[in-house]
Amino acid sequence: MVREKVRVSTRTLQWKCVESRIDSKRLYYGRFILSPLMKGQADTIGIAMRRILLGEMEGTCITRAKSEKISHEYSTIVGIQEPVHEILMNLKEIVLKSNLYGIRDASICFKGPGYVTAQNIILPPSVVIVDNTQHIANVTEPIQLCIGLQIERDRGYRINTLKNFQDGSYNIDAIFMPVRNANHSIHSYVNGNEKQEILFLEIWTNGSLTPKEALYEASRNLIDLFIPFLHAEEEKLNFENNEHKVTLPLFTCHDLLAKTKLKKKKKEIAFKSIFIDQLELPPKIYNCLKKSNIHTLLELLTKSKEDLMKIEHFRVEDVKHILDILEIEKHFP
């Protein structure tokens, strides 16, 4: 573990890694500071970085498995200790590292008896396993276990409603997010007559990249979002020229209603793409929502106060905490 005493500049804006450690092959931690910032800037940057880290980072994982020995997801295979469903869940947990794009094929071909682990996966050259010891199955008899795998790189979650196909392949719910969690906090102080802030940013990753690499990538992604505004400034459009003149049509009540419906539809699509991982939820509330199959902000917004109270282990203060968050989120444009 590396930890540094925090010393901040009073003039030049700079960032620094003040703590880093490797808790396991699949859990890296880093703590960073950015200072000095003017009042309000730390929260602006912290919220944006956290959303990018949890929602926009790309990762690689197994998204489909196929085997002739599998009749259905909840079946068992003679000579294998785990049921098929558990094997698929173990494959879902395998952490991969790559820069591939598109779909790649991989496979497992194991002769029992013995333990099948991540190191038994035959991968394309562009893909690396982060933890070779991850358990997949226990083959208890001298049989051949062959599984075809599909690997993809994407972002966020992919919850598959269609689980199995006629060719004997099974979709696996994919968690592409390489960042397990991200938090930010703010320390305010007075420098002379000026109020300033220090932003503390904590990042946990799954080992496919370090927290420092995640910070770099998230920063690039955030910068890319603002580049179009810079280009618009550089173009310096001449609106005095006739070719740039636009005649605005008159709106009717029907047009206004249609526009309102379209805006509502766009908002629903936006909420559908925001996962509850991107909300600042306590671990207990987050876990209860996931167990209730609530994965997105849209799914959360459709729940009433009474629906939330029916969730197992939920208390009144938990529901109030969620309602406070929803009150903020639903006003986003």
Swiss-Prot record:
- Top-rank taxon of the source lineage equals Eukaryota
Alphabetized SMART domains for the sequence? RPOLD
What UniProt keywords apply to this chain's record, in alphabetical order? Chloroplast, DNA-directed RNA polymerase, Nucleotidyltransferase, Plastid, Transcription, Transferase
Major place of residence: plastid
- Which InterPro entries does this one have? DNA-dir_RNA_pol_insert, DNA-dir_RNA_pol_RpoA/D/Rpb3, DNA-dir_RpoA, RBP11-like, RNAP_asu_C, RNApol_insert_sf
Does the record carry Calcium as a key word? no
Q: Where in the cell is it found?
A: Plastid, Chloroplast
Chain segments carrying region Alpha C-terminal domain (alpha-CTD): 266-333
Record bears the keyword tRNA-binding: no
Q: Which reaction does it catalyse?
A: RNA(n) + a ribonucleoside 5'-triphosphate = RNA(n+1) + diphosphate
> Quaternary structure per UniProt?
In plastids the minimal PEP RNA polymerase catalytic core is composed of four subunits: alpha, beta, beta', and beta''. When a (nuclear-encoded) sigma factor is associated with the core the holoenzyme is formed, which can initiate transcription.
Q: Record's HAMAP family?
A: RNApol_bact_RpoA (MF_00059)
- Family label: Belongs to the RNA polymerase alpha chain family.
Name of the protein described by the UniProt record: DNA-directed RNA polymerase subunit alpha
Q: Which organism is it from?
A: Lotus japonicus (Lotus corniculatus var. japonicus)
